């Protein structure tokens, strides 16, 4: 599994849903939830192709009810660590909202465990901002687990933020 102690681009998401299905109106698709935005780099990038300055795609259109998921992180790396936090770089969209952080599943009925939550508010500047949440429950978790971000807001059909990258930190 992926090392949660290394920063990862949000664009590696393998699971993203919205509150309702996308509409396919050729040649355009209309999305009602999260998706990975395409980015292009002019020329051939030099150096490490996995460097976030080269290889970066944000997850956008994160509306109320959207879920963004990642498989799999190896939480043996965080086992036993103190003061564990999740740091996530977002661009707020100017509305009040919450991003809940889950492991295993985004649903309790399917074995999901909520490990943290972050708030966005309408007064936040719409520039790249680092949000933090304590994720102390990871201190006791081991093995490969899926990670999910669940978007919540009372404002329907408006993106809460763009998600750029994230990393877990601890001592």
Model regions and ranges:
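Extracytoplasmic
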Residues: 1-171
């Amino acid at each position: 599994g992926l090392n949660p102690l290394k920063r990862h681009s949000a664009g590696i998401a393998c699971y993203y849903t919205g509150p309702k299905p996308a509409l396919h109106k050729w040649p355009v698709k209309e999305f009602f939830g999260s998706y990975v935005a395409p980015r292009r780099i002019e020329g051939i990038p030099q150096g490490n192709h996995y460097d976030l300055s080269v290889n970066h795609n944000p997850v956008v259109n994160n509306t109320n009810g959207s879920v963004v998921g990642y498989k799999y992180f190896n939480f043996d790396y965080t086992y036993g660590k103190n003061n564990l936090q999740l740091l996530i770089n977002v661009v707020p969209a100017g509305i009040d909202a919450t991003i809940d952080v889950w492991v295993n599943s985004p649903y309790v009925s399917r074995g999901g465990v909520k490990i943290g939550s972050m708030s966005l508010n309408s007064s936040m500047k719409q520039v790249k901002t680092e949000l933090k949440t304590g994720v102390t429950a990871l201190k006791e978790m081991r093995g490969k687990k899926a990670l999910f971000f669940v978007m919540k807001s009372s404002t329907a059909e408006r993106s809460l933020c763009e998600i750029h990258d994230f990393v877990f930190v601890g001592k």
